[in-house]
């Protein structure tokens, strides 16, 4: 059977865990396009970036929602989920991997910490066209428009494809569809976190710490994903698995370092 004559195989993952609302919206949306396989962390794994589990076994379990089979959980990270899904759970290679829909944006430097984005990048490493979707809120989330846009973009990407080792990181404002200003193709903005470790004491008086901080934007303009999404634009940012700063290589050559 030719690829265009069958329904595409779509793998759905996230980093918020299989009970997160976003993955249920995303899976339902993708089922209108193809055959969906859901493989997600058993527990939330936000901020895990491209971590994978070594030295301890991974456990795979079936997960039921409303008394119906929904997908599989993996006792590991989002990247573990992609690896296990491709090597063990899925019988055929997927045509598309979609990760999300994440609680909270994954823009600027937050991209580097994101398990949602890392799952999509792992898909690209494995040679599968991959997308990452994030909603710009941690509370009072309305995934309605995000699910609708995810399906629209996924359909287009299935038709057009993406360059090798490239994903799209998609950030969607948490506003009604009528308030969406449009779609912007952006770069990864510049930012940093104002880090703060909040100290508390346990029942024995021993200190422990919660990491906290605020994302500070270091550039402005509609070319920045964070700047644009704050102005209610959906942003599409092409990301590559190649982290090389190619423009700096010629400068390094001029250093003429010797062994």
Swiss-Prot record:
Q: What does the record give under GO molecular function? A: 3'-nucleotidase activity; 5'-nucleotidase activity; exopolyphosphatase activity; metal ion binding; nucleotide binding
Keywords, in A-Z order? Cytoplasm, Hydrolase, Metal-binding, Nucleotide-binding
**Which InterPro entries does the UniProt record give?**
SurE (IPR030048), SurE-like_Pase/nucleotidase (IPR002828), SurE-like_sf (IPR036523)
Enzymatic class = hydrolase
Q: What is its main location?
A: cytoplasm
Cofactor(s) this protein requires: a divalent metal cation
Q: Which Gene3D superfamilies match?
A: Survival protein SurE-like phosphatase/nucleotidase
Any idea where this protein resides? Cytoplasm
**Which Gene Ontology cellular component annotation is one that this UniProt entry carries?**
cytoplasm
Stored Pfam families: SurE
Q: Record's superkingdom?
A: Bacteria
Catalysed reactions, as listed in the record? a ribonucleoside 5'-phosphate + H2O = a ribonucleoside + phosphate
Q: Does the keyword Nuclease apply?
A: no
Which of this chain's residues are annotated to bind a divalent metal cation? 15-16, 46, 102
User: EC number(s) of the enzyme?
Assistant: 3.1.3.5
Q: How is the cofactor bound?
A: Binds 1 divalent metal cation per subunit.
Per the record's keyword annotation, is Nucleotide-binding included, yes or no?
yes
Q: What does this protein do?
A: Nucleotidase that shows phosphatase activity on nucleoside 5'-monophosphates.
Family to which the UniProt record says this protein belongs? Belongs to the SurE nucleotidase family.
| Name of the protein this chain belongs to | 5'-nucleotidase SurE
What species is given as this protein's source?
Chlorobium luteolum (strain DSM 273 / BCRC 81028 / 2530)
């Amino acid at each position: 059977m030719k690829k265009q004559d069958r329904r595409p195989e779509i793998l759905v993952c996230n980093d918020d865990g299989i009970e997160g609302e976003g993955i249920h919206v995303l899976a339902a949306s993708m089922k209108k396009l193809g055959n969906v396989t859901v493989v997600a962390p058993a527990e939330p794994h936000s901020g895990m970036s491209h971590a994978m589990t070594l030295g301890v076994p991974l456990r795979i379990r079936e997960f039921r929602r409303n008394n119906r089979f929904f997908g599989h959980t993996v006792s590991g990270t989002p990247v573990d989920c992609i690896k296990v899904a491709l090597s063990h759970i899925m019988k055929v290679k997927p045509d598309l991997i979609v990760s999300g829909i994440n609680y909270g944006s994954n823009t600027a430097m937050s991209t580097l910490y994101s398990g949602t984005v890392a799952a999509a990048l792992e898909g690209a490493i494995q040679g599968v066209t991959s997308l990452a979707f994030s909603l710009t809120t941690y509370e009072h989330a309305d995934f309605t428009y995000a699910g609708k846009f995810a399906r629209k973009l996924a359909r287009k990407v299935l038709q057009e494809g993406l360059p090798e080792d490239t994903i799209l990181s998609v950030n969607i404002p948490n506003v009604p569809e009528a308030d969406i200003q449009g779609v912007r193709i952006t770069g990864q903005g510049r930012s940093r976190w104002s880090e703060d470790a909040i100290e508390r004491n346990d029942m024995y008086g021993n200190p422990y710490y919660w990491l906290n901080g605020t994302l500070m934007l270091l550039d402005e303009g509609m070319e920045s994903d964070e700047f644009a999404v704050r102005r209610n634009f959906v942003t599409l940012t092409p990301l590559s698995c190649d982290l090389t700063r190619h423009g700096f290589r010629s400068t390094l050559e001029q250093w003429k370092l010797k062994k």
